[in-house]
Amino acid sequence: MMITIRPDEISSIIREQIEQYNNEIQVVNMGTVLQVGDGIARIHGLYEVMAGELVEFEDSTVGIALNLETQNVGVVLMGDGLTIKEGSFVKTTGKIAQIPVSDAFLGRIVNALAQPIDGRGPIPASEFRLIESPAPGIVSRRSVYEPLQTGLIAIDSMIPIGRGQRELIIGDRQTGKTAVATDTILNQKGQNVVCVYVAIGQKASSVAQVVNMLRERSAMEYTIVVVEPADSPATLQYLAPYTGTALAEYFMYKKKHTLIIYDDLSKQAQAYRQMSLLLRRPPGREAYPGDVFYLHSRLLERAAKLNSQLGEGSITALPIVETQAGDVSAYIPTNVISITDGQIFLSSDLFNAGIRPAINVGLSVSRVGSAAQIKAMKQVAGKLKLELAQTAELEAFAQFASDLDKGTQDQLARGQRLRESLKQPQSTPLTVEEQIATIFTGTNGYLDRFDIREVKKFLDQLREYLKKKKPQFGEIIRTTKIFTEEAEALLREAIKEQTELFVVQQKN
């Protein structure tokens, strides 16, 4: 059987093929590896690469182009890079580092690339944010005016923190810096605040401890944990705080309040120093590169209180910095102190003396001040800092004076009881009304009759008594936010009744 060839059919097929032909040329910017090691690769031939652009190696390892030089490009690797060889190919991606963001991140543990590391499967996300995005401008902000309660009496009364503030937590190792931060997370329960805890270069066991504590106290429901432990590449330790901030910004621009904790920025600076020295950038003071101030300022400036047009969302930042032997004048501590709106100084001497949280009230300051306090707290805690400072001065004087007059002895005794009333066990944050009751009791001399060892027990019982027998007191403070005459009368009555009960208990 003869096959009849129809020329018109063939020509129509050819015409169709020509129409569908796509003659686009895909240009991929390629380079070759000159040298690789210590988490750094030098690449030749990567022309037109952007600063901070992601580049991809043959083995799918991703890196960031940080040093753009005339002959080559210095790339920091976001992985171990063990299979990258000299001469292997590298291509540009045309992307700047970005991460997926969504509400589904709440309750999850992720790494610096926002990939889940808690074994609970992928996190759905439809949106992306740049890891390094610009901070809100002056016009986009408003001044800090709402308190962010930490639940710690010493902080909320004397070093108040407001929503949108940056407050540094600084102190030697093992002085309870992380405890102050985690207690603040616990106190945000029911306050509609999203918390982000960024652990940089910490031991995996310490991070696991924090996560378990947050889980036990049902705080993981509103918390995201970003972890890059001590064995992570320096690049990822350097990126982790920016990743945490990008996640917090997602919620801030959705009109929510967020709290972010960087634990700690000393480790991030060390990771950045390591990267910079390996990239052969000139070292400066303490061998840190010249732009280490910019490293932290561009991070912390992203914490803000947005204006009403943008929805009044906020990011409150609590960066942690570790000092060596209490030296606040080292490079990183002075840098971060000058960037933040105040600092909480934790002293190892106070910690060892059993004063916990070990806050040195004399050296700690909040530059937002009473703008971040409710009126009731201002009314009660106004003289507290002054009284404690006078007590410290008197104690120094009393070491040299043999006999003190009655007035001085009374003032010393009251100061010691006040200091005792500020002690608080870890993971037991107090509500504002409980704090107000505690401070009022101390500053008005109601604790003077008790032995120092009885103060804690009495205050615990008083707070319980107020909750059960005088719930109106807490109601007044919560609704009016003012320490009214009625609230004062209720509190004085409760103190009187509880004192009588306590005295009877002690006798029995």
Curated annotation (Swiss-Prot):
Its EC number is 7.1.2.2. It is an enzyme of class 7 (translocase). Keywords: ATP synthesis, ATP-binding, CF(1), Chloroplast, Hydrogen ion transport, Ion transport, Membrane, Nucleotide-binding, Plastid, Thylakoid, Translocase, Transport. CDD domains: ATP-synt_F1_alpha_C, ATP-synt_F1_alpha_N, F1-ATPase_alpha_CD. The record marks 364 as: Required for activity. F-type ATPases have 2 components, CF(1) - the catalytic core - and CF(0) - the membrane proton channel. CF(1) has five subunits: alpha(3), beta(3), gamma(1), delta(1), epsilon(1). CF(0) has four main subunits: a, b, b' and c. This is ATP synthase subunit alpha, chloroplastic.
